[in-house]
């Protein structure tokens, strides 16, 4: 039995599962691998540094930090024939573009702090040869900036059996009902104010009189507040968030054009679609790879106006099964795990 340890550099030390990034990049893969006979555990970089954890075969470091003790342990693993992989789901290592990051642009960190964070992340990256990433643009950027020869495998975020079972439970057992005409926007962090502002006029025009549900930290533009029935709810727990998604007919996911956003995952589509929602989204590469009658892609303001109108007006005419099956077939975690296993086998042949 192969033993796999996922190590995440998350600030959520007590309950890392509720960090969405850790859930997708560590727990979801671990659950699927456990089903296939692997022995998998998830821990934090804090625990990895503090304890002797050297009895695993494969180590996956999610967003690895630059810390002398941490790096020494990683080097020991590499020198002792362990399979060592760095995993990224965000462009946290690109010093050249650090000041274009939402961390800096949202004012959550000073220029000095942002450059320090990105410099340390970049320094950590240079100690790894093998990488898994959530999107193709992320992989391309690692190839571009790496100083040594590297190998990168794209393992997309995908739907898990656990997420599907939550949605199915809401659909069949709890009978959570759609709120007619409700359009939802789900913001995990305060960094999305500008994204929403870019499409505010389109929302106000195409969704006038409809309920707009905003969940999480976001400043709702005045033009939307005047035109729509706005409901705002603070950030909620994971299961409650899924329930709120399931009450929406349409979920929107606007993003401004930037190198950082182009590297983001398209999970907003498949999470919402499997919950029975149509989706209007900016076609970042990881959204653009999906096709569905219930996915409406928009970039310009006029495209957003049209897409919002089409999504809201066509909701009842598109079978719920189309939304669910499209998401299930195109965001299949079993296919992603197969890619991961092939990559690990390739590494194993090289390090043995």
Segments (PLM) and residue ranges:
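N-terminal pre-catalytic "stem/leader" segment of glycosyltransferase-like enzymes
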Residues: 1-61, 65
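Conserved catalytic-core segment of nucleotide-activated headgroup transferases in glycan assembly
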Residues: 8-32, 157-226, 231-246
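Acceptor-binding helix/loop patch of EC 2.4 sugar-transfer enzymes
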Residues: 12, 16-17, 86-118, 162-168, ...
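Membrane-proximal helix-turn-helix segments that form the acceptor-binding/catalytic region
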Residues: 75-76, 108-131
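Donor nucleotide-sugar binding/catalytic pocket of nucleotide-sugar-dependent glycosyltransferases
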Residues: 127-172
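A charged, aromatic-enriched C-terminal amphipathic alpha-helix characteristic of glycosyltransferases
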Residues: 168-170, 313-348
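Nucleotide-sugar-dependent
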Residues: 190-194, 238-239, 243-244, 249, ...
């Amino acid at each position: 039995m192969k033993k796999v340890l996922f190590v995440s550099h998350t600030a959520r030390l007590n309950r890392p599962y509720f960090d969405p990034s850790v859930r997708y990049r560590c727990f979801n893969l671990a659950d699927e691998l456990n089903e296939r006979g692997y022995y998998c555990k998830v821990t934090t970089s804090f625990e990895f540094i503090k304890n002797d954890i050297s009895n695993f075969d494969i180590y996956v470091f999610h967003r690895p930090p630059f810390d002398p003790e941490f790096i020494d342990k990683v080097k020991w693993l590499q020198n002792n024939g362990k399979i060592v992989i760095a995993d990224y789901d965000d462009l946290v290592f690109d010093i050249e573009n650090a000041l274009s990051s939402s961390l800096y642009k949202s004012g959550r960190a000073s220029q000095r702090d942002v450059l320090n964070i990105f410099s340390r992340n970049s320094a950590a990256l240079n100690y790894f040869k093998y990488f898994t990433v959530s999107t193709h643009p992320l992989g391309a950027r690692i190839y571009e900036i790496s100083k040594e020869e590297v190998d990168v495998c794209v393992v997309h975020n995908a739907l898990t059996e656990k997420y599907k079972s939550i949605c199915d439970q809401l659909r069949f057992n709890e009978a959570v009902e759609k709120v007619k005409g409700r359009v939802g926007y789900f913001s995990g962090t305060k960094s999305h104010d500008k994204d929403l502002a870019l499409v505010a006029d389109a929302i106000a025009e195409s969704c006038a009189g409809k309920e707009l549900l905003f969940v999480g930290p976001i400043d709702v533009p005045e033009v939307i507040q005047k035109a729509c029935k706005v409901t705002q709810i603070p950030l909620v727990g994971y299961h409650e968030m899924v329930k709120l998604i399931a009450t929406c007919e349409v979920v929107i996911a606007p993003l401004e054009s930037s190198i950082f956003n182009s590297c983001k995952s398209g999970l907003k589509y498949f999470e919402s679609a499997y919950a029975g929602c149509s989706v209007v989204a900016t076609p970042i590469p990881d959204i653009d790879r999906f096709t569905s009658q219930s996915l409406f892609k928009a970039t310009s303001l006029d495209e957003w106006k049209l897409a919002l109108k089409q999504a809201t007006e066509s909701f009842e005419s598109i079978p719920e099964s189309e939304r669910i099956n499209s998401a299930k077939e195109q965001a299949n975690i079993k296919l992603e795990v197969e890619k991961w296993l092939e990559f690990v086998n390739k590494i194993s042949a090289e390090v043995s």
